[in-house]
Every structure is written in structure tokens, then in C-alpha cells.
């Protein structure tokens, strides 16, 4: 009876003990690129503001990862003197520039009109477009007709393979976490 109680208490302590934060979520130190050591949790001190967590934003069929403060103004544009080309060779654009580019693309996507595919107004617009830029439209249609469409069988085959890979990865992660738990309990 005491052994069961002791094992149960040990399992609860392991399950409810705070774990160290993920290395990717460590806040950056004063030296760029050098992570700070994780701080122990102290429930008696007042909360400190945390860094914002990444947010996944969907635009069409693509996903973008947004890091940073979402309350910051999205209207910030790149100034001509701070373009990535003038920042120096081999250097990356700053986070503010990346955020400005991200929000610029997001606003462009949101401002694009959304209309149904089979509407009569779209057919009329296509006719006007063909009359104005007939040569360009013809080249685009010709290019599309040359590319063979992806068959549904291939699509579903690829989807099945991706799902199997995800399932195998999930099982491997579960086995790894079980192994770690057994090592902790075994000690």
C-alpha cells in the first residue's frame, strides 16, 4: 500500500514539475544570437511581461509565421535608405523590415477582391481583358494548357505518404518521451 502511494506521489511530482523552456523559446541575451540561461520559476514574484509567441497566419494556401508584437503598426514601410540591398552584402534584413514586408503582403492579400469563379461579371471582365491584352492572355492560356494537371490518384498518394510520415514521427516522439519517463522513474 505504501509502495503504491509512494509511486503515485512520485509520478505526480514528475508530471506536475515545471520543465525547462524549449531552447527555441529562450529569450535572446544582450549579445545577438546568444541565448540567456533559463530563469527558475518563482510564483511569489509578480509576473514579468513575456515575449510574444509566434502566430501562424494563413494567406491563401501559404502559411506565414509572424513573430513579434501584433499591436505594432502594420503600416510601417521600408524606407528607401534601409533596403536590404543597401544594408550590406551578406546581411539579412532586420526584424522590423521583415515585419513591414510581411504586413505589406498581408494588406495586399486582404485588399484583393474575392468573387465567385463562375460569375457572369467575371466572364465579362475576361472578355474585356482579352480585348485589351489578348496577346498576353493567349500566351498565359497556352502556357497553362502545356502543363499537365496533377492527377487525383497522385495527389491522394502523396497525401497518404505525408500522413504516414507524420504518424511515424508522432510514434517516434511518443516512444522517446516514454523512454525518458521510464529513465526518470527508474532512477
Curated annotation (Swiss-Prot):
It comes from the Eukaryota. Keywords: Amidation, Cleavage on pair of basic residues, Hormone, Secreted, Signal. The keyword Phosphoprotein does not apply. Its main location: secreted. GO terms for molecular function: corticotropin-releasing hormone activity; corticotropin-releasing hormone receptor 1 binding; corticotropin-releasing hormone receptor 2 binding. Residues 75-95 are annotated as: Disordered. Residues 25-144 form a propeptide. Produced by the hypothalamus. Pfam families: CRF. Residues 1-24 form the signal peptide. Belongs to the sauvagine/corticotropin-releasing factor/urotensin I family. Interacts (via C-terminus) with CRFR1 (via N-terminal extracellular domain). This is Corticoliberin. The gene is Crh.
Amino acid at each position: 500500500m505504501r509502495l503504491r502511494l509512494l509511486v503515485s506521489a512520485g509520478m505526480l511530482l514528475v508530471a506536475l514539475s515545471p520543465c525547462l523552456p524549449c531552447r527555441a523559446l529562450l529569450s535572446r541575451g544582450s549579445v545577438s544570437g546568444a541565448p540567456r540561461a533559463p530563469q527558475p520559476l518563482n510564483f511569489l514574484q509578480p509576473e514579468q511581461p513575456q515575449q510574444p509567441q509566434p502566430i501562424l497566419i494563413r494567406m491563401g494556401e501559404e502559411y506565414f509565421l509572424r513573430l513579434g508584437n501584433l499591436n505594432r503598426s502594420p503600416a510601417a514601410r521600408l524606407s528607401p535608405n534601409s533596403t536590404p540591398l543597401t544594408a550590406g552584402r551578406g546581411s539579412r534584413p532586420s526584424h522590423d523590415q521583415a515585419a513591414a514586408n510581411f504586413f505589406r503582403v498581408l494588406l495586399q492579400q486582404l485588399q484583393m477582391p474575392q468573387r465567385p469563379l463562375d460569375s457572369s461579371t467575371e466572364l465579362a471582365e475576361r472578355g474585356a481583358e482579352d480585348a485589351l491584352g489578348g496577346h498576353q492572355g493567349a500566351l498565359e492560356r497556352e502556357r497553362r494548357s502545356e502543363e499537365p494537371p496533377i492527377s487525383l490518384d497522385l495527389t491522394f498518394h502523396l497525401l497518404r505518404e505525408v500522413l504516414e510520415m507524420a504518424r511515424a514521427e508522432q510514434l517516434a516522439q511518443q516512444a522517446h518521451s516514454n523512454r525518458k519517463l521510464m529513465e526518470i522513474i527508474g532512477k
